Amino acid sequence: MPLIMEDGINVDDLFGEPGSLELGLSPSTPSPRGLAQRLDEMRLIGCCQKIAWSKLGCIAYISQDGLRVNVRHLQCRPSDGKWVLSEETPLLPVTDAHGGHTLVHLCWNEPGAELAVADSSGRVSIYSISIALNSIAGHRQAAFDPDDDGAQIVGMMWLNTQRTVHSFYQAAKVQGRWAYSPFRRRPIGPFHPVNKAGLVCVTRSGIIRLLYQNPDSRWAEISAELKNTGYSDRLLTHAALVSTQGGILVATHSACQKICLYRVHIAWTPTQYDPGQQKPPAPWPVPSFRFLHCKVESQCDVPGTNRNAGDNAQGLPSFTNSFYCLTGLDIVLPALDNPAGSTANPWVVAIYSAPLHVTQDHPQQQGPASVIVRWQLDTGPLTLHPKFDDVPSKKNNAQVKPKLELRRLDDVYSDKYAISIDQIEYGNVLAITYDDGSVVFYDPKTMAVFNGVDDANTVTSLAQAGFHHPPEPSGLHISFSPNACAAVMLDGEGQTHLRLTEHSYGAEGGLHDENKYSAAIAALTLAFCRGCGSDVNTDDILLILVRQLTPEAQATFINEAYRALPINCNFTVEQDKLMNHPYIPRCLSIQAALGFKNKYTPRSFASSIPWAVLQLRHASVLYAFFFQYNKGGATEPHDPDVLRMVLGNTKWALDFSFYVLNELFDLADDFESLSGDQEAFTQKLKSTSSLPLIILLSSMSRAFLRFICRGLRGIYAGYATAAPLSGDARVYYAEIYQTLESAPIRIDAYEKFLAGVDSAVRHAYHGAGFGDAERPGPEKELLVNARVPPVLVPAVSTILRQTVPALKTEIDRITIYMGDYSWLGLSNDRRTEMYRRNRDVDIIKKIPCRPAASALPETNANANANQNGKSSTQVQQRRRRCVRCCEVSSDTHPPRSLLSFRMIAKLGLLRACVCGGMWTLEPSVYSSAQSSGAPVGQATGRTPALMAAGLAGSS
């Protein structure tokens, strides 16, 4: 026998260069960092989602050491107006709750406000976004669960909320214009009868658990064992859960490589619960499990070739399947945005992956890295043996229950490792992410790859219209944004990377394709409409609009959004619908955000109009709710915090009305010399950019001004009949009354002025023959393009020559002229710019804030602190900042009183700004604040009962 050393292998080279061994091994392509660990995680346990993007816009991810959860979000940077990912904020309550156990899985609920965190021992803790995206409070502690390896979570799903939302099926081009197909989408159960949160989990030992909240916001739990055919089936590795019309569909994969399917029903006793009628000790709803159709199972195999297309189909070499392991299991539902309802049966999708490194002894290394196996869930007749026909039946016409079957569909092969399968864009797109960072969009029905060139006249999703993710090796964990315009990836070193979808917008090869450009705008519009209808955060869409679209394309998008939702901008008659219109603030918000440049630069004129209308709407709704919540006899008819907010908004509303009048008086003086030349008047008007003039001409903003006057009149009259007040409430209400009493114009005189403007606008429409069908056009021109349409030029002439002069005798013009309106932030003068640089105004309370240290450069802040003889911690003031408009709120805690909490919750301002953007707590600047150990935005305690009771209904 020859010695091993006789084959020419030098022992000195054994640990040297591999090429010197001359073993004939081909060099292997280096795999991404952490891929082997990622594949092992996916093989061993079904719940290993390390990063998740909620529908409210919060991105939560597990740190590299597996002991912490950090959160980030998209935000507009105040200094330069650029949209970026925020700095990370660690959630210390998660680390404390799990006591050093490795965190393995994250999952947001459907509204995107509550987060479930699971560790390696199957313990689950639950948290909720309280007042800001980076302020998350604990609801359920992980200590409630035992420390048991058999309790590891292999599948998890939140119960849906019971609410009907508006949705959109598609956009189709009809006669050169896009037509959008809206419909009302009903929710899919099961639901919690109290509309509280519920979380369904499947454990490794085959136990299904339901964690649910009682009406008092405390968590309870029930559990049951899934029916199995053998002991080995109880050791589960993966489970997929999804809500269907027939109950919860559960697919499990066991250690013996068997896939089973279950239908789980959750029955509540009692089925309904009304807190207004139930009196203690009436029982709260208690759930129980019922299992149906538990016999569907399939022995999994990965064929060497596509068995449905003949031998060696698609040119694939044959390979063995003994080394393929399941690394992913999902259930794909038909598209939810379907006006006819979801009629198709769901699909079960499994990922089978080959080992990352194989030896020469196994020829299967020539096979694909991943095989995606799909089964269609079908219902078929239950066939019996013919001998059963001879058995007499005791029941005539006995109906045989249908049988559920799993029908194998064509497999999908890939030479890359599939690391994630996500159903996005409301079920219209299946996104598969591979180990090299590439993302491929598929049609869930056919598994055909979207290429963006199939049909330029029909748009069902962004992917179908040609949006795609360029190749980028950025990570092994991925989560898509609420509207799939962006994705965030987590790499092997625990770093996050933001990725945006891209589109050519018709610019290809130096030419312009109008069809592709139009389809891209329609796809963005469709995504925005779906987000508005489902009450989903749309910052990812705004990010695409700001970064990728020209101002002309942005204007096209805004016009499409107003037409698609649809929004009739004419409110000369139906003004009451304006207060509760769900889409108007959404459109105004994104319109205002597109014109934001930075904190110190004025907005564009076109975006300043919707920004002002948003402020008018806030004051109008505030006054309406103030009177609503103070009706009838109550122990505390007026809350000091509410009155302080009413006081600030009253001062703002009055100053805004004075600012409008002051501007109109100046315009009347400028146009006085042109009273006899209508042509010159019209030409000068075209070159005039006056925000107050547009606000008065627009029926929407004019209606809000009338609502504000009605509210101010009611507050003024109610002071005399108000219940006896004490303390701060008396001081605030007295100041409100005194502010109205000393105003340079009476409320009734201002209402008379608005009536004169309304009359001038109506006469202009009537004179031009514009009826209700023609008026939305010029009204939209005012609101969207900030231009005075030709039909309203006579109205402007009447206002400046007749309405404004008639008001002079009823006002104190000197006081209005000398007023300081810089704090409104609406002018472009030097005084307003200086105020904007030095002070902030609470956007909710309309009260000037103290200069915040975090908003100043650190050197200047420290210098100011030294000059005042105070430490930095004494001058620092924590605040919330809107991630969209960059305005601030001084409230960093939930409202203290019930009335104040109900008011803020009804206004929708617990987590969101007046503009609709989400709040974020500003980070700490000084080391003295950081040395305390708790970062800014940390809610270390449990959510108070008052807060927990109202969070579910706010957004």
Swiss-Prot record:
Domain of life: Eukaryota
Keyword entries, A-Z: Activator, Nucleus, Transcription, Transcription regulation
Family the entry assigns: Belongs to the Mediator complex subunit 16 family.
Pfam families: Med16_C, Med16_N
GO cellular component, one term: mediator complex
Record note on quaternary structure: Component of the Mediator complex.
SUPFAM superfamilies, alphabetized: WD40 repeat-like
Keyword Coiled coil assigned: no
Gene that this sequence comes from: sin4
Protein's name in the database: Mediator of RNA polymerase II transcription subunit 16
Signal peptide extent: none
GO biological process: positive regulation of DNA-templated transcription
Disulfide bonds: none
Keyword flag Transcription: yes
Compartment(s) where it occurs, according to its Swiss-Prot or TrEMBL record: Nucleus
Role according to the record: Component of the Mediator complex, a coactivator involved in the regulated transcription of nearly all RNA polymerase II-dependent genes. Mediator functions as a bridge to convey information from gene-specific regulatory proteins to the basal RNA polymerase II transcription machinery. Mediator is recruited to promoters by direct interactions with regulatory proteins and serves as a scaffold for the assembly of a functional preinitiation complex with RNA polymerase II and the general transcription factors.
Matching PANTHER family: MEDIATOR OF RNA POLYMERASE II TRANSCRIPTION SUBUNIT 16, THYROID HORMONE RECEPTOR-ASSOCIATED PROTEIN-RELATED
